[in-house]
Amino acid sequence: MRIIAPSVLSADFGHLADDLEMINRSEADWLHVDVMDGTFVPNISFGFPLMKPFKQYCTKPLDVHLMIVHPEKYVERFCDAGAWSVGFHLEAVEDPLPILEMIRKKGVRTCLTINPDIDVKRLVPYLEEVDMVLLMSVFAGFGGQKFIPETISKIRYIREEIDRRGLKTLIEIDGGVNTGNAAALFAAGADALVAGSAVFGAEDPIEAIRRMKE
């Protein structure tokens, strides 16, 4: 499985409808929506009001990544706003299971995320409880960072744990993804790659997406 999810955080918001139409015409599979609160990460992005134009102008499923504290207060509203999947950070909560159940009851796919400094083994107890795990390959909060190479070994580890249990849990990678490393990430066992500046900053974004899926 080779899923590409362009991150709308890197889009040109002065021409948002045009950028979303480009995504519609491309081979992209999902639209990745990064939600930041300025507390869990030192940056602020967007919230519920922008979910409406994302849903209105983009035909791709909305893959929502909550980089926020207290995700339990907001997951249901993002589900109601049109999210196809909702993920939140394991390190942001004491117990993820009740929050995952809130998402699941809305009929939305569940995802648990960790930053690069969180032990990947902490995801293992939840592999049977989620549809997807997201490994940050940069520190959450800003686009355009360089990929952290140690992510490759984490992908392999989680892939082995998923396969050993016979699960269908997907592995998504977010941060520093580009046409130069996408193939290696898929080869290591990733199913989905989030790409921001590598898509929206490319001379030919549609071609960049196609190349990453090769």
Give, region by region, the residue ranges found by the protein language model:
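Active-site/ligand-binding-proximal alpha/beta "capping" segment
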Residues: 139, 146-192
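Conserved N-terminal beta1-alpha1 strand-loop-helix module at the mouth
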Residues: 1-87, 93-95, 102, 110, ...
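Helix C-cap/helix->beta junction micro-motif
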Residues: 58, 106, 165-167
